[in-house]
Amino acid sequence: MKEFSKPIARARQVTTFIYRHGRLLDAMREKTGGRDLVRPGVTRFATAFLTLRSLHTHKDALKFLFVSDDWTRSKLARTEAGKKVHDTILSTKFWNSVEDCLRASQPLIVLLRIVDGDERPAMPEVQFCMEYAKKKIKENFPTRGKADLLKRILAIIDKRWEDQMDQPLYGAALYLNPNKYFDLKTDDVMAGKLRSAFTEVLSKMVPDQDLQNKIDDQALEYEDLRGSFSNKIAINNIKTKSPSKLFTDCTI
């Protein structure tokens, strides 16, 4: 998207310029309390937006740097590259674009951290976190003036999700994750999609028809919290026990 690619490119010009000139880099670090602007992430997407967030965090420090007497008297201030960086840092339009980028990217950065993390299995969380990320992005663009931008952001996310991640296995994993599934079950469309994903995976992984029927019956009990899933202990454990432990306890 032009609205994001342009500020990202300008931010890259700023950081490249600063990091290529030792004295300017030292002055920048003095203004930012020793903190760097470039923030590495797990992907190029994450790196770009983490760097934008760092620039935004140090916006005032950067403005002070590029209006200081030291900068004004420097040879760099008279170069074409220096003038461009100076204009970028003092541009209200640039900082507004950065804020839009951050509103769109922050929920996705959280999702990337979950997917890339070691502390919990990614698959049962991925689809729930994607839906939550989209919800947060919508909340980050509440004004009508940003409605078109929001629509295009969500369209890109949905297209990427469909191309790369919208696999029945992810939906089945979320369906079988009770501490997420029952929060989503109130949405009839989402509940139907997850049930369909589970059924598709079941038909592929369990060829025996009798066993399929038995598992499907247990799935219905799980959905409706009937049978062994209806006892108080099982219901209380929905939010605390791991999905595998809960199903082991309820289907023995």
PLM features per residue range, with description:
Residues M1-I252:
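Short alpha-helical patches at protein termini and domain edges
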